[in-house]
Amino acid sequence: MFREGSRDDAALVKEGLFDKLEIGIASDVTIRDKWSCGEIKKPETINYRTFKPEKGGLFCEKIFGPTKDWECYCGKYKKIKHKGIVCDRCGVEVTLSKVRRERMAHIELAVPIVHIWFFKTTPSRIGNVLGMTASDLERVIYYEEYVVIDPGNTDLVKKQLLNDAKYREVVEKWGKDAFVAKMGGEAVYDLLKSEDLESLLGELKERLRKTKSQQARMKLAKRLKIVEGFVSSSNRPEWMVLKNIPVVPPDLRPLVPLDGGRFATSDLNDLYRRVINRNNRLKAILRLKTPEVIVRNEKRMLQEAVDALFDNGRHGHPVMGAGNRPLKSLSEMLKGKNGRFRQNLLGKRVDYSGRSVIIVGPELKFNQCGLPKEMALELFEPFIIKRLKDQGSVYTIRSAKKMIQRGAPEVWDVLEEIIKGHPVLLNRAPTLHRLGIQAFEPVLIEGKAIRVHPLVCAAFNADFDGDQMAVHVPLSIEAQLEAKVLMMAPDNIFLPSSGKPVATPSKDMTLGIYYLMADPTYFPEEHGGKTKAFKDEVEVLRALNAGGFILKDEICGSRRDETGRGIHIHEKIKVRIDGQIIETTPGRVFFNTIVPKELGFQNYSMPSKRISELILQCYKKVGLEATVRFLDDLKELGFVQSTKAAISMGLKDVKIPEIKKEILKDAYDKVAVVKKQYEDGIITDGERHSKTISIWTEVSDLLSNALYSEIKKQTNSKHNPLFLMIDSGARGNKSQLKQLGALRGLMAKPNGAIIESPITSNFREGLTVLEYSISSHGARKGLADTALKTADSGYLTRRLVDVAQDVIITERDCGTLNHIEVSTIRQGSEELLPLKDRVYGRTVSENIYQPGDKSNVLAYAGDVLTSAQAEAIDDAGIESVKIRSTLTCESRRGVCAKCYGLNLANGRLIGLGEAVGIIAAQSIGEPGTQLTMRTFHLGGIAATSSTPEIVAECDGILVYLDLRVVVDQEGNNLVLNKMGALHLVQDEGRSLSEYKKLLSTKSIESLATFPVELGAKILVNDGAAVAAGQRIAEVELHNIPIICDKPGFVHYEDLVEGVSTEKVTNKNTGLVELIVKQHRGELHPQIAIYADANMKELVGTYAIPSGAIISVEEGQRIAPGMLLARLPRGAIKTKDITGGLPRVAELVEARKPEDAADIAKIDGVVDFKGIQKNKRILVVRDEITGMEEEHLISLTKHLIVQRGDSVIKGQQLTDGLVVPHEILEICGVRELQKYLVNEVQEVYRLQGVDINDKHVEIIVRQMLQKVRITDPGDTTLLFGEDVDKKEFYEENRRTEEDGGKPAQAVPVLLGITKASLGTESFISAASFQDTTRVLTDAACSSKTDYLLGFKENVIMGHMIPGGTGFDTHKRIKQHLEKEQEDLVFDFDSEFESVAG
């Protein structure tokens, strides 16, 4: 555990010279002889008059050391010269008072006491060793019943429980000496001591081998694991019962006198006093031969007092202190946010730091921050003192401090000198990702606020409405070097989560640049409107300066003449640039003076998105230094131009569209029609609600677009400030513009449901009282959401960090041949995420060729794809690419650089020791918080998305693939299944069957793909030609229809009124509707179709789910395509990350979703087999092998497959979300990984948040680190045990080498919380959650923590094994190993010489 040497363990621990930590159970001997410096016999603490500790009490100086440095209790010895002397009068050693922080004592107990952790923490360790239930043990420990320890020659059984009456009866029958039965801790101690663990282990293994029941095997395996832990460690089971209690050093449980004769004390002192009082009383009682019943009660009270000391409230009612508050026990000291681990070890307050309000510093360079002089003086004080002493200005520290307080002129000179090249760290809470702490060169400023460069605000998520930031000074040379090289703001201009620039101009800067780069404006002839020509940029700039740089739209005739003087910045001009004549504007020429030449002449308008692209392009072409200079220039230019342009918004700039009245009237008419349909009973109330909302959503979009185009139109002649702000991306968006000038639109209730009647007024017109009241609903929801969800998001980040903290880059290349396959992500025909974005920066696992040309290699196996290569692959039309991934990485610890790919923060291959796990966790957690905070910005506006029709984007041939359709009476094709799609293909003159064959084998690519829902109406026939803009299909948004595909007569089956159906009179329409209701029993509601009215020949049956409304009558004659019933879809709720965050948590915690979908277990064809116990029996039959898999599906679930449908393994059979564990079981690890990554990404994509796949992959990798043993073979592993893959393969390798049978296991999916607790490091797990359980578990099996992860090293005060500490750790490990080898060698040679 420690480096070998002559010094004692404590000294080594102090110096941190250890590389592993072992935990175990302390024996009584250890507590009494090794830890303790004396026994505490009195409950007294300090004398209330003298405030001096009482002798032999809880603060005794003789035991714990002096309260004053170098001074004994009685005052005989004072000063350091008596160091080490033990006073002959008071017995106190003369030493430093700080020993009172480390010296412990003990209390000798009158009777053995059971340690509550080992008995009450589930699973009960004592119960498992003895094979007794926790309730039986409890009765013994708390002196309610006797337990037989030695049955002797009686008919009793060992460990049998006897109550008082039974005990007396047995004593009468056999005599008191014929057997041994005891109560309390003593009994448990004797039982544990007499337990033969070796033979128990053999017996358990034998029983495990013979048992067939899965449940019993799991139980036995758990018990076996605990027993094995004791056998393999140096722990003895009887040590779980205490005879001595250790007492914590007094300075860790202080007692502080307050004014007025009262004391503030740690709760531990009260708890210790209770134990001592009861213990002393019990000792006295035992000496006096008191009646058994009193003794027993006193022993029980002592057990309870010790329980309260270790874990108050774990057994019975907690012990209360003053003010009826439960006292904080030793367990509470460790647990939770304010426990020792999280409060003092993982997060400490640091010296050399300060905080202040921040203000904007537009004059600063990118790598600078403004530091108030007073603050700098305080922070750099020791540096100043050293410099002043070196200069000879002062000779003592005291005089230097006085000089600093005086503010002498030379102090300021020294300060200026010191801060040059000494970076400081700025941090803004909450630090959600690594960009929350960055280093800057300080610039001394007057005032008291810290100045921050405007471009770093986005990374810190800072604004200047009162935000504060903390400043930290890196002290050591190494820390300063790290801050300079790795943490400077210019090195952090890209997001580690997506690789996009984070330092981009925003707000005013964007507006200024956009205005400068605006499209050319046409000036009439009378203002000299001829297009002027210039020979070069210099001439343009000269002309601009001559005219005083006119920026207003009002054009002064006097300023313009034929010589071209006083040109306008938006005027169209011709200029020769690089030998070419370009049509541009003076503004653009001026902007290009700051653009690096390598980027070429920028001749287009510059909204924020394009600026961002330009920065990325600049970094790739000219490197970091030039990019940072360019960013500073952009900032400067942006602010100057927006100030000069003086763009401000007036009320009249908000134009109300003229067609508003017309559109609203039309909408009200449509709503009236829908209402009439409802009253006539054609549609349900749910459908009416959904249709109404669809109408208003459409109106909202129409008006929004009308308003936007009106403002845009006006901008062509004169800049509309509102349009400038929105189009440039400086402030606001279309949705907010819509509320200002069109209508506020639909509002949401706090529960997410949409209020039907929209707010038709806008802010320019003003809201009515009713509208204002409806508005307040959504606004308040936004505020409440923010408060609640921020906490949720922070907790999610914490769990993610904990699960991924030890994923570091440990090697360059693991050499794996495994890969994953990625392709473009599409939604319908829309491309959501192109292939190039998914493969950029990833390692290719096999050569990629130009399609149809094997000689042209686009990328070789092992290449890390550059953006140019990724672009080429995408342009070549390649569908999917095989890439290496952290999911398939085979590194023994952490992951390798090749499987991870590029570091997105700098575009280079990731370096060794990089903490990619923590980066991944922050990348996923940070936007969660951002988005939850962002909900209220829309003021609760219902943001729903609806697309009721599909329109062809280009000309082509329409091909149905995997679609079952029926032609209705109007000649339209109605879709009967859910799995198919419409494909638009290039017209190449082939036959329809050829197209279908080529599409199904993926031999040709479709121009567009449209997945179609059940019940969609296709308006174009299969194989027909379509033109761009033609309507192809209409989608049913409000209902899931059940459509008949054959003609015939209707017959109701199992549609029994009052049992499976009910007639409901619609309150509003008065019409009676037949609805299928949820029911219990053997009924299987369905509609059968017969060929004739006599019901002789059955044509088909249709299962009707509960909640469906039946649309046909018994005996009615129907034609194909007619609606039999319809199941209304749930009312539309707004899409919001509020729904999204819990979804991410549900995925990463691997929880089973509510109303989960059933999925097919094998490939085959669907059939039904009736009903059993209120469940529908659905069978999937493999037609080749004849194999069948039965699915019992609740009648309340809605099936999305029908009889005769072909399904593939893992395909959904019912509506709902899929259970991830089922995907793992049925489809395997690869499919599950793909599912989890895509599902998490979908939540973020919906909010427009860009996170690279590799981050999600790391989290998913950590969730799949373990396997569950199904057959232990000859290994030491246990049945049902979850072990690390690494450990499993190692154990199997060892067993196979020894000629044994290897173990079998299946992969297991763990949620992130469970995975964190299952980590190898017990220190890391204990600091996360379930502290007592983790520590108990670790102590029982004497676990060793090798300090490999980050958290455990931070807790132990070591350098972390990542980043710059990665190499250091490696070197130390090698050095220690070498030292140990030398030691062994020396020992051997010594041994030989002695033997010789």
Swiss-Prot record:
The keyword Zinc applies. Binds 1 Mg(2+) ion per subunit. Binds 2 Zn(2+) ions per subunit. GO terms for biological process: DNA-templated transcription. The keyword Transferase applies. Zn(2+) 1 binds at C72, C74, C87, C90. Its cofactor is Mg(2+); Zn(2+). Mg(2+) binds at D463, D465, D467. It catalyses: RNA(n) + a ribonucleoside 5'-triphosphate = RNA(n+1) + diphosphate. It is an enzyme of class 2 (transferase). Keywords: DNA-directed RNA polymerase, Magnesium, Metal-binding, Nucleotidyltransferase, Transcription, Transferase, Zinc. Its EC number is 2.7.7.6. SUPFAM superfamilies: beta and beta-prime subunits of DNA dependent RNA-polymerase. One of its GO terms (molecular function) is zinc ion binding. Gene3D superfamilies: 1.10.132.30, 1.10.150.390, 1.10.1790.20, 1.10.40.90, 2.40.40.20, 2.40.50.100, RNA polymerase II, clamp domain, RNA polymerase Rpb1, domain 3. The RNAP catalytic core consists of 2 alpha, 1 beta, 1 beta' and 1 omega subunit. When a sigma factor is associated with the core the holoenzyme is formed, which can initiate transcription. PANTHER family: DNA-DIRECTED RNA POLYMERASE, DNA-DIRECTED RNA POLYMERASE SUBUNIT BETA. Belongs to the RNA polymerase beta' chain family. DNA-dependent RNA polymerase catalyzes the transcription of DNA into RNA using the four ribonucleoside triphosphates as substrates. This is DNA-directed RNA polymerase subunit beta'. The lineage of its organism: Bacteria, Pseudomonadati, Chlamydiota, Chlamydiia, Chlamydiales.
